[in-house]
Structure formats: structure tokens, C-alpha cells
Amino acid sequence: MDVSTQTRHATYFQDENQLQKDHIYVKKKSHIKLNTGVRAPFKAVDNINQQDEPTLIEGNNESSISSSTGDTFEEDFAYQDKVEIEERSIRSTPKSIGDDDLENREGSFDAPEGILTHGKHRLPTIPEWTKEDLAALSEAAARLQANPSPEDIETDPSMVPDYDPEIFHYMQSLERKLAPPPNYMSVQQEIDWVTRHMLVDWIVQVQIHFRLLPETLFLAVNLIDRFLSIKVVSLQKVQLVGLSALLIACKYEEIHPPSIYNFAHVVQGIFTVDEIIRAERYMLMLLDFDISWPGPMSFLRRISRADSYDHDIRMLAKYLQEVTLMDEIFIGAHISFIAATAYYLSMQMLGHLDWTPCHVYYSGYTARQLKPCAIIIMECLVDAPNHHNAIYRKYSENRMKRVSAFAHNWVLSVI
């Protein structure tokens, strides 16, 4: 592949024209509010059955939003083969491939070391291990194995009880291997944490519309974060990144995933089917086809064994897990730790105050380790309707037992 082809390939996720900062994107009947400045033209799910098209207001003139790639898509996009992708060392410092003077400016893309100071982002809460924690974990395992109760004996063959410890440890290794770096946004030029927040909120709306599994949602967000950590993306392409990640996650997790035509219909022509396919393939190649991130649901199911799969605790914990998707402070945190914290906090909210040795064994964490992260999740619930609007509305339905409203009111009552 010649240099010109590589340059054309790189322009797919980076638009040639600079964005005009005086543009204001307006959505009709949309829950996504796009304010002044640089914001991607997200298509709200509420609009998919409407004839009204969103408009781009520039000064006093209105013009329709069209595809950001124009008619020259085939000339502007080409693929690199597997060898070239490996030669680029995709797991190194993120780059924007299309710049001629990249080598001279590569130092400016280096992620800062230590505590990140970009915006309000802090390093995610990582559990600290003390001798007391390790002793409590060993004691819990010894007690459970010596005197198992009937509730502790797994009879469901689908849970593969004979290999349960090995599977659990393997998933823990995957969660560390496939976790995105917490400070990746420092390498981006046109997008920020606000853009990511809007994108994830839109992904949740699409998940609700297609009734997708929670596993699909979590995997999609993981793919988005990992992709953005190794590829500089323009603002106009960020929604295509989200759409591609959700399409991949659906194929991996769903029994009957929506078709690519369903996804193209959701964005109402902003991106064509061919563009989505090409973006999907490019994302998979850049991530080295490694999409086996375990997600929190498997860990949550294991912890639930400590309470005989109590439905109320699990439902509330599922909501608290999804809340962490919206805040950048949780990026890079071990997902088993997020699942354990969500379960611990849901127990506290429902009046189950004891974190027993059984909980320690199945979660792998002590209550002392979980409390700091639980406090951070509580902070996210103070202004829940604004912090995670789509998730809040999703879990305010009767079929979800209105756990979002319950959690919001509980936090307000204790602070």
C-alpha cells in the first residue's frame, strides 16, 4: 500500500474541513441537547419515525445536514492490511495517521503520566489490598469450602460450577487486559468528555429502542473507549464510532441482533450502510479483533449467589452499574470492582447492611475496599436526571421497579 493510500485511509475518521465554531445544531423532539460550539450531529432515537429533519443553523440561514463524507467516500477511504496495522504498533501512543508532519509533532500526543488534570477527570478508584483484605478473602474461601450451605452449592449446569474459580480468574485477567486507559481523552483534538457523555447517552437510547441486552451496552462503550484511546477522531465521525461499536457488540452478545439497515435508519442517512460496514471493519482491525472483554454482568451474577439471586438487589445493582458508564472517572476501573461496588451499594440502600464472608468470596473484595467507590457512585446520583438522563428514564419504568427514582431519593435523604 503506497503512502497516498494510507493518507486517504486516515482521513476516514478525520474530516478535511475545520468545524465552524459558530454553528449551533438543533434537534427537533430530541432528548439530546447540542449547545453552541463543536458538537456532533447526533440523530436522536425519538426522531426515527418522524419526517422532520434536524437542521444546521448557520447565522440566519438554514441548511440540511448531509453526510460528512460527501460523494468522494470511495476515493477517501482505503484499508490497510493486517501486516501494516501490526507495523504501526496500534497499542502504542495514539496517532492521527493523515498528518504529513506527524513525526515532528508526535510528542504532543503523549498521554500525561501520573494523576490526570484534564477537566474534572481523576484516576478511577482502584481497590487497594492490605494484609487484612487478603486474610479476609482467604478466610472467606476456607469457610465456604469447609461448610457450604445448600444456597452455596451451584446446581445450574450453565454456571459450570466445577470450573467456576478458574473462569472467574480468567475474566479478571481479561478485564485488566482490555480496560481502556483512564486518561485517553488527552490525545483527542476535537472531542472531549462532554462529547463522550453525549455519545454514551445516545447509545443508551438506541439500546432502549432495540431492547438490547445490558451486556451489549457495556461492550459497546468499552469498544468506544478503547478505539478512542488509539485513534484520533474528528467530531463529525464520533457518532460513527459509537454506531460501529454498538453493531459489533450486538453481533457478539445478541441472539437476534438488529440488522445494519436498522442502524442506518436510526441515523437517518447521516452515514450510509457502506460507511458503517467500513467503519466496523476498521474498528475491528484497529482493536486486533479482541472483543472478549467480560463486562460487569458475569461478575454481578456470581456475587448474586451470596443472596440466592435476590431480584431487588440485582435490579438496583444493574442500574448503578450503568450509571458508571456516563462518568469518565470510572474509565479504566476494574469492571469486577464496579460490579461488586454496585452490589454493595444496592444492599446498603435496601437495608442489607452486612457484607458477609460469602459476599467477600463471590465478589473478591471486602467492604473496606468498596466504600470509597460507593461514595463516588452516590455523588453521581445526586443530580441523576441530568447526570445520566437516558439511563434514569430507562430505570424509572415500572418493569424496572422504578429503581432510579428510589436510588435518587435515597441518596438525597442521606447526604
From Swiss-Prot:
Transmembrane segments: none annotated. Keywords: Cell cycle, Cell division, Cyclin, Mitosis, Phosphoprotein. It holds the Pfam family Cyclin_N. One of its GO terms (cellular component) is nucleus. The modification Phosphoserine is found at S96. GO terms for molecular function: cyclin-dependent protein serine/threonine kinase activator activity; cyclin-dependent protein serine/threonine kinase regulator activity. SMART domains: CYCLIN, Cyclin_C. GO terms for biological process: cell division; DNA recombination; G1/S transition of mitotic cell cycle; positive regulation of G1/S transition of mitotic cell cycle; positive regulation of proteasomal ubiquitin-dependent protein catabolic process; regulation of G1/S transition of mitotic cell cycle. Residues 57-71 have a biased composition (Low complexity). Residues 54-74, 86-118 are annotated as: Disordered. InterPro entries: Cyclin, Cyclin-like_dom, Cyclin-like_sf, Cyclin_C-dom, Cyclin_N, Cyclins_cyclin-box. CDD domains: CYCLIN_CLBs_yeast_rpt1, CYCLIN_CLBs_yeast_rpt2. Required for efficient passage of the G1/S transition. Belongs to the cyclin family. Cyclin G subfamily. This is G2/mitotic-specific cyclin cig1. The gene is cig1.
